UniProtKB/Swiss-Prot annotation:
Catalyzes the phosphorylation of autoinducer-2 (AI-2) to phospho-AI-2, which subsequently inactivates the transcriptional regulator LsrR and leads to the transcription of the lsr operon. Phosphorylates the ring-open form of (S)-4,5-dihydroxypentane-2,3-dione (DPD), which is the precursor to all AI-2 signaling molecules, at the C5 position. Keywords: Cytoplasm, Kinase, Transferase. Its EC number is 2.7.1.189. One of its GO terms (cellular component) is cytoplasm. It is found in: Cytoplasm. SUPFAM superfamilies: Actin-like ATPase domain. It catalyses: (S)-4,5-dihydroxypentane-2,3-dione + ATP = (2S)-2-hydroxy-3,4-dioxopentyl phosphate + ADP + H(+). HAMAP family: LsrK. GO terms for molecular function: autoinducer-2 kinase activity. Belongs to the FGGY kinase family. It comes from Salmonella typhimurium (strain LT2 / SGSC1412 / ATCC 700720). Pfam families: FGGY_C, FGGY_N. The gene is lsrK. This is Autoinducer-2 kinase.
Length: 530
């Protein structure tokens, strides 16, 4: 039987639970921010039969997987549970969990669950088509992936769950609840519900009332890095952590990732290169975009918000290109003992900037209010095999990802007045040295690449450490622990080439969107309700 831990201050390690879209991880860090061990398990979010767009989160199975990861991490680290000073949790944003009056989780969905497309359209028509603008003005979110249409969907289609609902939280809060029995949300993750006021960092209950929904189901709000509770006896027996270990409020994956990268001061900017690419800029005070092109999220740093733009499927597009067209390069890379992307980058480095005018059409710049993309394609190909080949297309894709990022950063600067003087490039994309240099050349900014490129779990561990007094504050610790791998300075000649390429791409992309509007091609992705 697990024993009550009464000396958590003697622990020498911190644990971060990271619930991503495709997997859950338990990561153990020492008090210098060094990663010691990881337990990881993939999970799937399955569609409900006859519910188009649904992506349910399997609460029972996924908790078992989380416990498995915790046990695995402890075993790999070869440390006792008493060595863990504190635990915190982070997760994909937008996903929500519903609880009944007994505190039992009864329903959950993952981040891009799109079942409520009809409800999104219905809500947009409220108050002479101004309801979404009011939601955005208050919360920095549109309705597409917010909790409001999902709750309305439950009221329409699952009234049994809707009427039993007593509390709603995010997925990170659910993991913390399963550990401690305490229910609360933090602003950085709960902000993506579209129900949190950017100024007060608390719930805006009137938005639910305006939608004709119940406003009595909102959890207490606690800031990241504060004490939530302690590991319960039940949780200790399930996952082998020590009962009584402090559980600290965590947050949203992107904001905690920025904390782990030291992006904690006003005007600091980051490009996070994963399956999706996010371009984030810290703002000193809450402000929203009059054109509703970008989302605004609470940072984990109190009083600070982040503008966030998203490039769709950027990393996924690169994987598609590698797997669909580069079987030969994958075999060669395997024989050489290197990553296939490294080989493709080496090939692409011999292609001149501008990639002979090839224009990839994949993700658009972010248009949060009316969010959809053109059909995937390559434009302006040549039939000269010396100029148009796999290396050229690969370089064109890397250049295009940087161009979309630059356009998104320009949109942010236009309404916020905040101009970046450098940026941090992290995530899987930042492993590419050519890609990092292209990003510098396209944006005209110095690009800093950290040693720890996947920093979400580190940011979560920082929250845990601050919560038990290991470190003094979130911002100070994030800056202290980040280490830099390399720096890329922009090449002025390449910058001029990319300025022209960017202007042409923007014009061509608008024509490609028009083909989607005319029903002639199929969008890469459309937001629910369009």
């Amino acid at each position: 039987m697990a024993r009550l831990c009464t000396h958590t201050e003697s622990g020498h390690y911190l644990m971060a639970l990271d619930a991503g879209t495709g997997s859950v991880r338990a990561v153990i860090f020492d008090l210098q921010g060094k990663q010691i061990a990881v337990g990881q398990a993939e999970w799937q979010h399955l569609a409900v039969p006859d519910v188009p767009g649904s992506m349910e989160f399997d609460l029972a199975k996924n908790w078992q997987l989380a416990c498995q990861c915790i046990r695995q991490a402890l075993q790999k680290a070869a440390i006792p549970a008493t060595a863990i000073a504190a635990v915190s949790a982070c997760s994909m944003r937008e996903g929500i969990v519903i609880y009944d009056s007994n505190g039992e989780p009864i329903w959950a969905c993952a981040n891009v669950d799109a079942r409520a497309a009809h409800e999104v359209s219905e809500l947009k028509e409220l108050y002479d088509n101004t309801f979404e603008e009011e939601v955005y003005r208050c919360s920095g979110q549109t309705l597409a992936l917010s909790a409001i249409p999902r709750l309305l969907w439950l009221a329409h289609h699952r009234p049994d769950i809707y009427h039993r609902a007593s509390t709603v939280t995010m997925i990170s809060d659910w993991m913390a609840f399963m550990l401690s029995g305490e229910l609360a949300v933090d602003p950085s993750n709960a902000g993506t519900t579209g129900l949190l006021d950017l100024v007060t960092r608390n719930w805006k209950r009137s938005l639910l009332q305006m939608a004709g929904l119940r406003s009595d189901i909102l959890s207490p709000v606690k800031e990241t890095g504060t004490l939530l509770g302690h590991i319960s006896q039940k949780a200790a027996e399930q996952c082998d952590l020590q009962a009584g270990t402090p559980v600290i409020v965590g947050g949203g994956d992107v904001q905690l990732g920025c904390l782990g990268l030291g992006v904690v001061r006003p005007a600091q900017t980051a490009v996070l290169g994963g399956t999706f690419w996010q371009q984030v800029v810290n703002l000193p005070a809450p402000v929203t975009d009059p054109n509703m092109n970008v989302r605004i999220n609470p940072h984990v740093i109190p009083g600070m918000v982040q503008t966030e733009s998203i490039s769709f499927f950027t990393g996924l597009t690169m994987r598609w290109f590698r797997d669909a067209f580069c079987a030969e390069e994958k075999l060669i890379a395997e024989r050489l003992g290197i990553d296939a992307y490294s080989l493709l980058e080496d090939m692409a480095s011999r292609v001149p900037p501008g990639a002979y005018g090839v224009m990839p059409i994949f993700s658009d710049v972010m248009r949060f209010k009316r969010w959809y993309h053109a059909a995937p394609s390559f434009i302006n190909l040549s039939i000269d095999p010396e100029k148009c080949n796999k290396a050229t297309l690969f370089r064109a894709l890397e250049e295009n990802a940087a161009i979309v990022s630059a356009c998104n950063l320009q949109q942010i600067a236009a309404f916020s007045g905040v101009q970046a003087d450098s940026l941090v490039f992290a995530g899987g994309g930042s492993k590419g040295k050519l890609w990092s240099q292209i990003l510098a050349d396209v944006t005209g900014l110095t690009v800093h690449v950290p040693v720890v490129k996947e920093a979400t779990a580190l940011g979560c561990a920082i929250a845990a450490g601050v919560g038990v007094g290991v470190w003094p504050s979130l911002a100070e610790t994030g800056e202290k622990l980040v280490r830099w791998d390399r720096e890329h300075k922009p090449n002025p000649e390449n910058f001029a080439v990319y300025q022209q390429a960017r202007e042409k791409w923007q014009a061509v992309y608008q024509d490609q969107r028009a083909l989607v509007d005319g029903g002639l091609t199929t969008s890469l992705w459309k937001a629910p309700g369009l």
